[in-house]
């Protein structure tokens, strides 16, 4: 990965990325979804060029093609690419999603329950999206609490699409919680116990806390 500097990508880097996606598509066949996250790194012409080059490989979505500060930039990309667009992890509260939904700037939205205002706000955003027939796929960059909070909300959302996790295996979260998350055939099992249904491993968290960045545990 890299930071946003001027929104460009080198010719070699671009070709490498396209080659990787081509190889993935060939390996998994036509029926497996391939989702691309641009992480808001690109300017408008670069995002358009990349999306068009990736289109032949039938990607499910091109996520955050441009930085989130400009809906106008997002619209330019939206109007000039055939790939489906996903945005939302860096949008905060339901009000930020209004122009995205009203102007049809995305095919999918990806609000983050911990960044956008909590469980109630995620539910409101999802209900708004339902009125526009836009699927919701909650973002995860914070761990098992984030995953489980998003899962609980999605149990009540007809337009739920997929639940993201930042880990290739949910078992990577096991050390942080007293009981592991259970995933069967790709489906996260939501506990029936009170609250979110998980308990944090407080002793583990205390052992690895960084004093400069943490309060009482």
Locate the predicted segments by residue.
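Metal-dependent enolase-superfamily TIM-barrel catalytic cores that perform enediolate-based chemistry
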Residues: 1-75, 80
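Structural signal for hydrophobic packing residues in well-ordered secondary-structure cores
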Residues: 25-28, 58, 154-158, 209-212
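Shared catalytic-loop signature of beta/alpha-barrel
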Residues: 52, 58, 67-187, 191
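C-terminal extensions of enzymes
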Residues: 177-217
